[in-house]
Amino acid sequence: MNINVANLLNGNYILLLFVVLSLGLCLGKLRLGPVQLGNSIGVLVVSLLLGQQHFSINTEALSLGFMLFIFCVGVEAGPNFFSIFFRDGKNYFMLALVMVGSAMLLALGLGKFFGWGIGLTAGMLAGSMTSTPVLVGAGDTLRNTASMGSQLGIEQDHLSLGYALTYLVGLVSLIFGARYLPKLQHQDLPTSAQQIARERGLDADSQRKVYLPVIRAYRVGPELVDWAAGKNLRELGIYRQTGCYIERIRRNGILASPDGDAVLQIGDEIALVGYPDSHSRLNSNFRDGKEVFDRDLLDMRIVTEEIVVKNHNAVGKRLSQLKLTDHGCFLNRIVRSQIEMPIDDSVVLNKGDVLQVSGDARRVKSIADRIGFISIHSQVTDLLAFCAFFVIGIMVGLITIQFSNFTFGIGNAAGLLFAGIMLGFLRANHPTFGYIPQGALNMVKEFGLMVFMAGVGLSAGSTINSSLGEVGIQMLASGLIVSLVPVVICFLFGAYVLKMNRALLFGAMMGARTCAPAMDIISDTARSNIPALGYAGTYAIANVLLTLAGSLIVIIWPELPG
């Protein structure tokens, strides 16, 4: 039995697609020194190579892939987008705008200088910024530009070619910039991180172990009563001194939950709740009374829940104002835009932030009702909301706007991005609406992106040889410029205009580039996870701005002088 692989792949689009994805994902696992190629570039390289052999794929698959990807980007950005845009994220918004705006202007200037078309120029911008949202936004706007005519296919091929040529340049140059740029300025990052840690009263260490609180029971002896000196629990402030709080007291056989006015007496049995290291550091006055085993006293269900910040009495407040420990709860982590934040009493809470809180089930439920709601523990996606907002996004994308003789459409990219942001925002406000497990969202977003990359690579592969010799060196040099110059501009703007702390500034710069590998290097250099505060501040807004930049560069290109 003879099998003609070429005919088999050409006759079966689905098989070809998954062969490209499988080979590309394998290639993406390879590392060049400290740099991993990544899934996007792996799939793109394989699809370009197969495209050279005249394999092709249905363009509808390409369209569906980019639609799924950009919609999921909007859903992820939605919970924090408006709070960053309108509230305390002004500096972060301005940094992201400077980064994206300067890169777009440089790309436009270089494209005109070298005489490229819009496809190469937009592709170079996307690759240099290592930003698939730019690629997606530009590709969608190209398809909806009637004036392209017969040039449309060529420009689409050049779009993916420009991206493929400059992606690794953008990634490697940013990683080296993240490693060496902090050393060229006067303030070192560890010192800046420690300064923020001292000002805000948090641990600057980037590694933090999280434990569940445990409960132990002790009998109150004369030493503890003498130490209390007749003060009630409110006056004693036991949590501030020990890291534990008194959950229950048994006195004369009666079990009760104490209020702040209770005074400890000899013979009381108290249940203390705290982290294991807090118990190990307890003052000897507690241990002089014997530890006791009392089934009823120790009968407390410790739970850990993820609470989504929603209510007005929590949004805009500092973490310290929640007084979680006063309510018998322990904060394990804070997540914003899928980025884990340092636990910082000065962090201002945004709508959609997720707090992981441990404590007695009743107390955690009470805290959740006060600040928002407990995130649904479900693996079931609200497909109705997902599909309905997807349809809304496509409908919004059909809207056209006319200025004098100039007409342009909003396009599917902007429409779906808007619809995704709205779905994410509504999800952050209504616990039972539009739920999408993070794993499912990641899978759909990644799959959509890989399908899109496979489509553009197969489409452009047939023209890569003829185009590469003409623009290769120019493209690589331009990619290096567009990758690094905006980073320098952004640093100068943040350091000397906004006067930001350097650790926060470098984190915010990497967030504006949406580059996680570079962010890891910044955290290592700072020996702290404090730069994550800045990274989370710019990440969500940068994803949106990058998508819009991809569309905008195509729209304004014809209006620029040749």
Swiss-Prot record:
Keyword field contains Transmembrane helix: yes
NCBIfam families linked: PRK04972.1, YidE_YbjL_dupl
TM region(s), chain numbering: 8-28, 32-52, 66-86, 93-113, 116-136, 158-178, 383-403, 406-426, 447-467, 478-498, 537-557
Family membership: Belongs to the AAE transporter (TC 2.A.81) family. YbjL subfamily.
Subcellular location: Cell membrane
GO molecular function, one term: monoatomic cation transmembrane transporter activity
Annotated Gene Ontology cellular component terms: plasma membrane
Membrane-related topology note: Multi-pass membrane protein
Entry protein name: Putative transport protein PC1_1686
InterPro entries reported for this sequence: AAE_transporter, RCK_C, RCK_C_sf, Transp_YbjL_put, YidE_YbjL
Keyword list, A-Z: Cell membrane, Membrane, Repeat, Transmembrane, Transmembrane helix, Transport
Record-linked SUPFAM superfamilies: TrkA C-terminal domain-like
RCK C-terminal domain residues: 202-288, 292-373
Principal place of residence: membrane
Pfam family, one: TrkA_C
One of the protein's GO biological processes: potassium ion transport
